[in-house]
Amino acid sequence: MYLFRRTSKAVKRKRRTHFKLSVPGMVECPSCGEAKLAHRVCKACGTYKGKEVISK
């Protein structure tokens, strides 16, 4: 049986530097000017691609 060497804090933290969240792609709504997620319906006015999808 082989005893493995303990992973040090530095090695563990260097490996985890790539585990991070990405910033969501925010764009300005062409109808109302609110910030919204790209390729999704605007929560403020309910429009998508210039058409009203959700009536507010």
Swiss-Prot record:
GO terms for biological process: translation. One of its GO terms (molecular function) is structural constituent of ribosome. Keywords: Ribonucleoprotein, Ribosomal protein. It comes from the Bacteria. InterPro entries: Ribosomal_bL32, Ribosomal_bL32_bact, Ribosomal_zn-bd. One of its GO terms (cellular component) is cytosolic large ribosomal subunit. Pfam families: Ribosomal_L32p. PANTHER family: 50S RIBOSOMAL PROTEIN L32, LARGE RIBOSOMAL SUBUNIT PROTEIN BL32. HAMAP family: Ribosomal_bL32 (MF_00340). Belongs to the bacterial ribosomal protein bL32 family. This is Large ribosomal subunit protein bL32. It comes from Bacillus cereus (strain ATCC 14579 / DSM 31 / CCUG 7414 / JCM 2152 / NBRC 15305 / NCIMB 9373 / NCTC 2599 / NRRL B-3711).
